[in-house]
Amino acid sequence: MTSLSNSLSADTGTTSFSPAAGGEVSDFFALLKPRVMVLVIFTALVGMVVSDATVNPVIAAISLLMIAVGAGASGCLNMWWDADIDALMTRTAKRPIPDGRIRPDEALAFGIVLSVGSVLILGLASNWLAAGLLAFTIVFYAVIYSMWLKRATAQNIVIGGAAGALPPVVGQAAVTGHVGIESLVLFAIIFIWTPPHFWALALVKSGEYARAGIPMMPNVAGPDSTRRQIIWYSLVLAPLALLPVWLGFGGWLYAVVGVLGGLGMLAGAVQVYRLREGEPERKAAMGLFAFSILYLFLLFSALLAEQGLGLFRAVAA
C-alpha cells in the first residue's frame, strides 16, 4: 500500500492529502460509515426477532450496539486501507482521510480498538459464538474484501457481500446462542441482493472505478454482461426472498411485499438491460439502485412487523 501522505496521481490530474493534526468527533464518526451502521442494526434486529426464543431486552440492546460498533470498526479500517483510491473518486474524495481531516495512523488505531472492544464486550455480554461471528465479519470485510478482493477481482462484490449479509446471523446467535435456518435464509437474501444492487451503481460510476483501478464488473466483463448478470441475480432473488413464507416465519404481509418487490426488482433489471445510452441509461441504473434499497428495507420491515411487533401471523404456521 502506498503511503497515504504522498500525492496520488490519476490520469486526469493529481490529488493529494496531508496528515491532519487530529480530527473532530464528527470526522471519527464519519469513519464508521454511519449509514451502513444503521442498516446493520436493522438487519441484525430482524435476525433477533425471527428467532424462536425469549429475548432479554438488555442483552439484545448491548448486542445490537456492539454489532453496530463492530461494523463501524470494519468500515473505519476499510477507509484507512482505501484512502488512496478514495481520493480519486468523486463520491469518496471528501472522506476524512483523503480530505486530510484525520491521519491514517489515527484511523487505523481507532478501527483496531473498536474492533477488539466490540468483540470482547459482545462475548462477555452475550456469548462467544456471536462474538466469534462478529470477529469473522470484521476480518472478512476489512482484510479479505478490502485488502484483497476489492482490487483483485470483478467478483469482489459477490464474494465480499458475505460480510454485509452476516449481521442477521450474528444477531440471532447473540440472543439464542446458536445459528438457525431463519438467519441463514436472511443471509442468503442479502447475499444475492448485493450484486444487482451495487452493479447498478457501478454501471453509472464505471469511469470513476476505472480511474481508481478497481475491477468492477462493468469495467472487466463489460456493461452488457453486467446487465445480463443483474437480471439473473434478480431472477434468483425473487423466489429466494419468499423462503421465509414457506418456512413459516414470514406471514401474508411479508408474502405481498416479497412478491411485489421481487417483480419490481425484475422490472428494474429489465429496464437497465433495455436502456443502454445517455440519460435514460443513467436513470434506469440509479432507479434500480434506489429501488433495491427500498425493497430490502420493506422486506425486512415486514418481518419486523410480523415477528417483532406481533402484528401478523405466519401463513405457514
From Swiss-Prot:
Keywords: Cell inner membrane, Cell membrane, Heme biosynthesis, Membrane, Transferase, Transmembrane, Transmembrane helix. One of its GO terms (molecular function) is protoheme IX farnesyltransferase activity. It comes from the Bacteria. One of its GO terms (biological process) is heme O biosynthetic process. The keyword Magnesium does not apply. It is a multi-pass membrane protein. GO terms for cellular component: plasma membrane. Belongs to the UbiA prenyltransferase family. Protoheme IX farnesyltransferase subfamily. This is Protoheme IX farnesyltransferase. It comes from Methylorubrum extorquens (strain CM4 / NCIMB 13688). The gene is ctaB.
